[in-house]
């Protein structure tokens, strides 16, 4: 006699659940993504809560408190001007995260516009891509250094310089996806139905380019934080009186032996932030990129 399978032996498929929920579940199954998300949340919370968990005065100096080592009174010690490093590192997180996120979002938006325009309007493809190739011929950090030095040490200059350096990468990613999508049957059907270019782009092309663009955005976010720290270290990035991780490291390089903590803590903050965002980007790439997807 044939035995009937127990109802508990069947697993109900995820019917009716939105793609966003299913994607979030797949992401949360990945340990590296969870670690990156937790680390990034810690950095973001520290930056947001900085006015309440520090003395709120990142530029307050005290000759009497110069070169104080880490302790209960000053968790990260003080620098050569007697400024509290715990306060400066947390306020520096606000600047670095804001610049990194702004650069990533602007690069993604402008890169998407250029990439889709090049793929859809083929008469502009050669011109736009040659400009992107010319920008990509220079290492991103060297291009950013040149633009930032020409514009002067301002926050807006840093954002313009870094955005200019990373737009080509986003544009090429979007163009590659859009070139494939424009030849699909449903895009041809939309053309035959009389849909306008704008409608096809916004309804069929752009939404299907978002996955690779989002992955690229996360990596640009991490690269922008590192690049901003580099520019500030060289003195052409975030200007005083804004606290910046790169400028704090630069101020501590002359005291790396006797006051090692000046360089150590902002360096750790840069490393943790870049690592966290890269771990998140790796998880997004594995889940969202069809070429690397290994699980349904």
Curated annotation (Swiss-Prot):
**What GO terms fall under cellular component here?**
plasma membrane
Localisation per UniProt entry = Cell inner membrane
How is this protein positioned relative to the membrane?
Multi-pass membrane protein
Give the function comment from the record: Probably part of an ABC transporter complex that could be involved in peptide import. Probably responsible for the translocation of the substrate across the membrane.
Query: What's the subunit arrangement here?
Result: The complex is composed of two ATP-binding proteins (BRA1094), two transmembrane proteins (BRA1092 and BRA1093) and a solute-binding protein (BRA1090).
Keyword Membrane tagged? yes
- Principal location listed in the UniProt entry: membrane
Give the family from UniProt.
Answer: Belongs to the binding-protein-dependent transport system permease family.
Q: Which UniProt keywords apply?
A: Cell inner membrane, Cell membrane, Membrane, Transmembrane, Transmembrane helix, Transport
Domain ABC transmembrane type-1 intervals: 97-281
Q: Identify the InterPro entries for this entry.
A: BP-dependent_transpt_permease, MetI-like, MetI-like_sf, OppC_N
Q: Name one GO biological process term.
A: transmembrane transport
Membrane-spanning segments: 35-55, 97-117, 131-151, 205-225, 229-249, 260-280
- Would you tell me the protein name for this molecule? Putative peptide transport system permease protein BRA1093/BS1330_II1085
User: One Pfam family for this entry, by name?
Assistant: BPD_transp_1
Q: Does the keyword Transmembrane helix apply?
A: yes
């Amino acid at each position: 006699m044939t035995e009937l399978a127990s109802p508990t032996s069947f697993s109900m498929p995820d019917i009716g659940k939105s793609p966003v929920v299913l994607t979030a579940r797949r992401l949360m199954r990945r340990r590296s993504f969870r670690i990156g998300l937790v680390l990034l949340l810690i950095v973001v919370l520290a930056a947001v809560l900085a006015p309440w968990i520090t003395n709120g005065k990142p530029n307050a100096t005290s000759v009497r408190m110069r070169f104080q080592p880490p302790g209960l009174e000053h968790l990260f010690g003080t620098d050569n001007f007697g400024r509290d490093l715990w306060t400066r590192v947390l306020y520096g997180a606000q600047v670095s995260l804001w610049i990194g996120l702004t650069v990533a979002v602007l690069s993604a938006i402008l890169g998407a516009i250029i990439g889709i325009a090049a793929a859809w309007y083929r008469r502009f493809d050669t011109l736009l891509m040659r400009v992107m190739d010319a920008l990509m011929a220079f290492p991103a950090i060297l291009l950013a250094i040149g633009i930032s030095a020409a514009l002067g040490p301002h926050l807006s200059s840093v954002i313009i310089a870094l955005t200019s350096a990373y737009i080509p990468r986003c544009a090429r990613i979007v163009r590659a996806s859009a070139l494939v999508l424009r030849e699909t049957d449903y895009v041809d059907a939309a053309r035959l139905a009389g849909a306008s270019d704008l409608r096809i782009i916004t309804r069929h092309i752009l939404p299907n380019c978002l996955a690779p663009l989002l992955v690229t955005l996360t990596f640009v976010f991490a690269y922008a934080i590192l690049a901003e720290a580099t520019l500030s270290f060289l003195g052409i990035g975030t200007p005083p009186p804004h606290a910046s991780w790169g400028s704090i490291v630069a101020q501590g390089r002359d005291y790396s032996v006797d006051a090692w903590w000046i360089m150590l803590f902002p360096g750790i903050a840069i490393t943790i932030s870049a690592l966290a965002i890269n771990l998140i980007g790796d998880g997004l790439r594995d889940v969202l990129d069809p070429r690397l997807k290994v699980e349904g």
